[in-house]
Amino acid sequence: DPRDVLVLPQGAEELDPSRPIGCASARRAVQLRALFPGVAVAPVRGNVLTRLRKLDEGQFSALVLAAAGLKRLGLEERITRYFTVEELLPAAGQGILALQTRAGEELSCLDGVLDADGTDCARAERAFVRALDGGCSAPTAAHARLEGDTVTIDGLYVTDAGEVRRG
């Protein structure tokens, strides 16, 4: 699942505009400022459990995290709302599981598991980021999908002048 999610403090039903939304990436921060004008966005550090503790202690009105990470940790019940990829474009490769093996290993046991379409989309997303000379901390986003035989990418990047480009 490549989507980002909104997580509110336990017991809360809506955002508290007096406290910031916490996120750990420039990509999310840029998009959140457009989605929630007037609400502050602040960095949050630590592993997922530490971030959730900070949220529940009142340091933030909400957190924005990767859906896949919460699901893998068995914390899906903490998800308040899923953002569509149109609302918040994910990081390239977000939600994708990868397997690294040694050269020459027998991989036929993976024949029923590998997803060729997903692999093509992941490669396209990575190529988009590479073409922009982006990295883990650069505010870039990419979401690829297969439309027939064509891979289509929705992408986002921030120019050196701070302009957000999306298309």
Q: Which residues does each PLM region occupy?
A:
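A conserved helix-loop-strand patch within extracytoplasmic ligand-binding domains
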Residues: 1-38
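Small-molecule-sensing regulatory modules
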Residues: 34-167
